[in-house]
UniProtKB/Swiss-Prot annotation:
Main function: Catalyzes the NADPH-dependent reduction of L-glutamate 5-phosphate into L-glutamate 5-semialdehyde and phosphate. The product spontaneously undergoes cyclization to form 1-pyrroline-5-carboxylate.
Name of the encoding gene: proA
PROSITE patterns: PROA (PS01223)
GO molecular function term, any single one: NADP binding
UniProt xrefs under InterPro entries: Ald_DH/histidinol_DH, Ald_DH_C, Ald_DH_N, Aldehyde_DH_dom, G-glutamylP_reductase_CS, Glu-5-SA_DH, GPR_dom
Disulphide connectivity of cysteines: none
Keywords for this protein: Amino-acid biosynthesis, Cytoplasm, NADP, Oxidoreductase, Proline biosynthesis
Source organism per UniProt: Shewanella piezotolerans (strain WP3 / JCM 13877)
Protein name: Gamma-glutamyl phosphate reductase
Known EC number: 1.2.1.41
Entry's Gene Ontology cellular component terms: cytoplasm
Pathway: Amino-acid biosynthesis; L-proline biosynthesis; L-glutamate 5-semialdehyde from L-glutamate: step 2/2
């Protein structure tokens, strides 16, 4: 079977399965998700063993620590993934809800109702937790899904999908509601992007190269995002003692994810006192620094080395314990820097001045903008959405963390009384 024939078969099966999903009641979907959670718990040892194969292979292939951290699915992370299923079960199912309705002058009673998108294709890299997150959100909203994970997590993804598909069968549903492309041939990605006869939306979760490939080749609507060049501005009226803790959380807690902090902008009034204190604390956590000339000047007599920041470094999503630092003279300069280098993901300001905070929130055009909070909150779970499909940095059809509602569309329903148009 050729790749094209394989993909068409996959798409046809997914489309057929989506019709069965679309007719499920909320109770049936809840039973399915509970079954998946139970089976994942029972298969915990097998899943972790499969993931360990991926980790060992990644180490043998010389992959970076950041990449290995991304693909790791140990017991705490797996239990967190399973807990997220329970969170999704508790969320309101948007499918079938009425958005609005009205009686028209022509006699029609018109309403908009939320319905599943149909079939979703998700292309992602070294994160096996995405396999479960996506499948659960898709099933909750009545969508079939075609998954194409990275070759680095092939064993993990196969183990996870086997469990999910067994739950589908146990609940009397088509296993093809969730399908995995387990062939690492990259041409299959290009083929999936053109499977518009069957697939309704593509969600790429990966780096710039994957995002660019999807944007250039897809004949299907694509949700772009997941690249997080995130900024935090320490205003002249910030509480500097509290600011260090927020920045440490944003940078250090989990540096390999897209909502981790990349660049700190510091008002020049506080630079001489704040930057040395910040660098001293973060250095104890293994953070290295790129800084502007003013940053290097205020750190000249300190032991922490500050490498010269460049356009390239400011344009980098570090995904590691590396932080850019830039001194700015005003809120306007901070906003200008963010507008130039941000990926549109998450930005934050630390300030006790409510007017400055409001100006920042109005001026910065990113998916999530914070006042006195870490950028790490940009997450479906933290936003109360349950697990997320992705974090969209575009403005159509979804923006920011994509939860259940982002996996639906609507259709117009019109009731008449043998009504004709005049």
């Amino acid at each position: 079977m050729s790749n094209n024939e394989f993909l068409n078969k996959l798409g046809e099966q997914a489309k057929k399965a989506s019709y069965a999903l679309a007719s499920l009641t909320g109770q049936q979907k809840t039973a399915l998700l509970r079954c998946i959670a139970s089976k994942l718990t029972d298969a915990k040892a097998n899943i972790i063993a499969a993931n360990q194969q991926d980790v060992e292979q990644a180490k043998a292939n010389g992959l970076s620590e950041a990449m290995i951290d991304r693909l790791l699915l140990d017991e705490p992370r797996l239990l967190s993934v399973i807990a997220d299923i329970d969170n999704v079960i508790g969320l309101t199912d948007p499918v079938g809800s009425e958005i609005d309705s009205r009686l028209l002058d022509n006699g029609l009673r018109l309403s908009r109702r939320r319905v599943p998108l149909g079939v979703i294709g998700v292309i992602y890299e070294a994160r096996p937790n995405v396999t479960v997150d996506i499948a659960v959100l898709a099933l909750k909203t009545g969508n079939a899904v075609i998954l194409r994970g990275g070759k680095e997590t092939l064993a993990s993804n196969k183990a996870l999908c086997k469990v999910i598909r067994s739950a589908m069968a146990e609940q009397g549903l088509p296993e093809d509601c969730v399908q995995l492309i387990d062939n690492p041939d990259r041409s299959l990605v290009s083929g999936l992007l053109k499977l518009d006869k069957y697939v309704d939306m593509i969600v790429p979760r990966g780096g710039q190269n994957l995002q660019r490939l999807c944007a250039e080749q897809a004949t299907i609507p694509v949700i772009l995002g997941g690249i997080g060049i995130c900024h935090l501005f320490v205003d002249v009226q910030a509480d500097l003692d509290k600011a260090v803790a927020v920045i440490e959380n944003a940078k250090v807690q989990r540096p390999t994810v897209c909502n981790a902090l990349d660049t700190v902008l510091v008002h020049q009034t506080n630079a001489a006192s704040f930057i040395p204190a910040l660098c001293q604390q973060l250095a104890t956590k293994g953070v290295s620094f790129y800084g502007c000339a003013q940053t290097q000047a205020v750190m000249a007599n300190n032991e922490q080395q500050i490498m010269q920041a460049t356009d390239e470094s400011y344009s980098t999503e570090w995904l590691s314990l590396t932080l850019g630092i830039k001194v700015v003279g005003s809120l306007e300069e901070a906003v200008a820097h963010i507008r130039q280098y941000s990926s549109g993901h998450s930005e934050s300001i630390l300030t006790d001045n409510i007017h400055t905070a409001s100006e920042f929130m109005n001026a910065v055009d990113s998916a999530a903008v914070y006042v006195n909070a870490s950028t790490r909150f940009t997450d479906g779970g933290e936003f109360g959405l349950g697990a997320e499909v992705a974090v969209s940095t575009q403005k159509l059809h979804a923006r920011g963390p994509m939860g259940l509602e982002a996996l639906t569309t609507y259709k117009w329903l019109a009731w008449g009384d043998y009504t004709v148009r005049g």
